[in-house]
Amino acid sequence: MSLRPTPCADIPANTAAVARAAFPKGNVYLRLRDELGTIFTDAPFAPLFASRGQPAACPWRLALVTLLQFAENLSDRRAAEAVRSRIDWKYLLGLELTDPGFDASVLSEFRGRLVAGGAEQLLLDTLLTLCRERKLLRPRGRQRTDSTHVLGAVRGLNRLECAIETLRAALNALASAAPDWLRAHADPDWGERYAGRAEEAHVPPGEATRRAFAEQVGRDGHHLLAAVTAPEAPIWLREVPAVELLRRVWVQSFCLVPAEAVPAPTPGAPGQVEPLVRWRGEAEGFPAALQLISSPYDPEVRYAKKRTTAWIGYKVHLTETCDEDGPHLITHVATTPAPVADREVLAGGHEALAAKGLLPDTHLVDAGYVGAHELVASRRDHDVTLFGPTPKDHHWQAQAENGFTLRDFRLDWEREIATCPAGQRSGRWRLDQRRGHAVVKVRFSARDCQPCALKARCTHAERRELMLQPRAEHEALEAARAREGEAAFAQEYRRRAGVEGTLSAGVRAQALRRARYIGLAKTQLQHVVTAAAMNLVRLGAWLAGTPLARTRQSAFARLMLQPACA
């Protein structure tokens, strides 16, 4: 498909007349067209199309239709019908009343071009640029960030079900690609074992019988992989995606006991000694959650658990403005695998906001985003104040009523000496590494600690040892903890709660918490378009002068908050 740029023409007279007659008091889409114009043009989408070929549908209109579709949570077919039938859509798109629209498949093709071209952020960024030009958005204010879980567009499977489904997927792929080869190499029993889905399989109860069942599945998969990788097998069979995925899942789910470790067969018994396929348990070890494939139908979904919520899928992070003198607009969206910690996306979010020229002055976040390194890096790299509760101290000294915590020690960073509450100085101060991060380890002498009258409040070990972060991180964390104890902290931090309402609105109105598509890139596109659609709705409300809704309170709560009568 090639792009033939379509000029953003005026609204046809007939369309405008009918729309004004149908909506004499205005409409959100009419208002958006009158105030913001067409929002998009064809130029930013030109790199996504070839220079030759059949003319493509107008991309600026497809972008706008995509936002409307997500704003109203419509399917492709219903969105295409709305283009043909709804006068407010025709007004916003600048179409004639008689315009027949386009086939619903065009929307899927357009999203595919955005993903293939790495342009997932284009729709949101273009809208934000327009808002900056219209003075509806400004940098260096307050912004807030929060995340929520996203269920993948696949059924949740446990490890055994995932192994069975992966083998079934490989067999189905080979049955279509190489039916004669598969019939020649398949075990006759496989037809009964793997004809139905994994949840239909009869898994026997009991740990031992369940492991034996899993290892039978492992032997079947190992047999198939051995046949595929045999020298006489067609080389292209190894390149079938389902076969490669089978290999990866078998590595994470099973291990091989070498043939020499397998007891020799009894004399006269036929056959050759083969490696023993063993189901991986805690003793054998298996990959961390970030590498563990959880479904053969979306290899990028991952398992995660946060407090009482467990899910297979992704996690989405939304950042929005929260200044009182403008609309609250989402400025950045990040979709990650489910196990990725919140604070790991903070640096990337700040870099993306810096590229857009939309960095905040104060960034309100919850405790999951706050760490000593993040406090320093945000201020040093982007001049952003990270504002939120700090990580808690879980050492027993902090939990005890009168224990001596790190705050009770005086630190002389220049002389590299720590002084304990009893006045004793440390004997050793040295740099070290812990989980890839620089730390300072401080040790006191056992000769000072053992006879100390305060030892019971300080340590249960022979001597007290401290683990410090580098000076900049340590001082930033201590300053943030001191700030957290001030009365003004709670008042300022209250502003962060509004982003939870944004997540709630996205979940209820746009199904934000359920992935529509397979794969991380397409799910990221879904979330970016959802954010842009939410911005479109908020802009319409702001232009109409609709005030922000206040937190709902019951009649009883309002009554009890009123001052008592004298």
Which residue stretches match the model-derived regions?
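Short arginine-rich
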Residues: K90-G94
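Short amphipathic alpha-helical segments enriched in hydrophobics
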Residues: L36, F40-P47, I87, L174, ...
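Hydrophobic alpha-helical membrane-insertion signals
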Residues: M1-L30
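Contiguous, well-ordered alpha-helical segments that form the cores/surfaces of helical PPI scaffolds
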Residues: P59-F70, S85, W89, V316-E320, ...
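Anion-binding and metal-coordination hotspots
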Residues: R78, V83, E96-P100, S108-A566
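Basic, short loop/linker segments at the boundary and entry of helix-turn-helix/winged-helix-like folds
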Residues: F23-L67, A71
